[in-house]
Amino acid sequence: VLISVGLLPLLMNSPSLLATKEYSEFSTRSKSDITINADGSAKESLSGLDKEYITEYSYGVLESLNLIFPRFMGGGSSERIREDSKLMNFIRSLDANQAQQVYQYSKVYWGNQPIVAAPAYIGISLFFIFLLSILLVNDLNRKWILIAISISLFLSWGKNFSFLTDLMIDYFPLYDKFRAVSSIQIIIEFCIPLFAVMGLSKFFSNNTKEVQKLNSLKYASVFLVSLILVFYFFGTSILDFKSDFEIFSQYPEILNLLIEERQYVFKSDVLRSLIIVVCCSITFYLFVKKIIKKDLTFLIITLIVIFDLWIVDKNYVNSDQFVKK
């Protein structure tokens, strides 16, 4: 039965997989006829993309926290400084050419990926429910979901976790045709909401004891709130808010103002996350204590999740990206 279940989705997707395989033979991911690089050295890979190219978009280990704090490292690489920031006031004091150059390179993003359209944010509210689910649900589903999330996260680190990445590139079929290793986080973005729904089902079940619900809620809340408070009060001391590609490294006056802006963005997002987690925690507590009913609890949590995701997503996909015909 297990083999049949595994083969069914493979057969359903076989047309697109076979078409992709056929196309790849005529693309840059196919076997190369050129065996040397421009400098005369031997090419690293002849059957697919080379490791440096594959791992160019490797997620930073620390940067992975933007899964729950969207602008932990500044958000996307197109993020701009605030109009009322100290850096913007400094830019206004420059002449036109200098101001344009400084503004152009004043990036709030300080991660080490070359281009990031938007953070891979899954929602602090969903992550809180996911933590609650881990503590509440103890079955086979928890095991395979945690394994899938862990492997996906490690693979998304690419060159920052080279042992596993090199192993996959060298021995896993067609992995050397994978352009951006960070995109494998789609597995995380699928598994966390899925398990959150499983956890909610058990949390709302009458068969689950009140003490189980309260303990799960307490531990999830304490852990996440403690983590958020550590970042809020000590984050600016722990982190340096500098990337490996700082344009203004030789201009400390500009760099210090840019770091100050990054710290502001960081703390404002962390504070926002704290408010959302507290709202979720209070809502669940009121339900467990039978102060509010299940339907109202579900409605409030749904609205919190929608607000949490929408307020971030609208910064990257909004009416400015669309035009009327």
What are these regions (language model features)?
Residues 14-133, 234-273:
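Periplasmic/ER-lumenal interhelical loops and adjacent helix-loop junctions
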Residues 1-7, 137-325:
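Contiguous transmembrane helix-bundle modules in multi-pass membrane proteins
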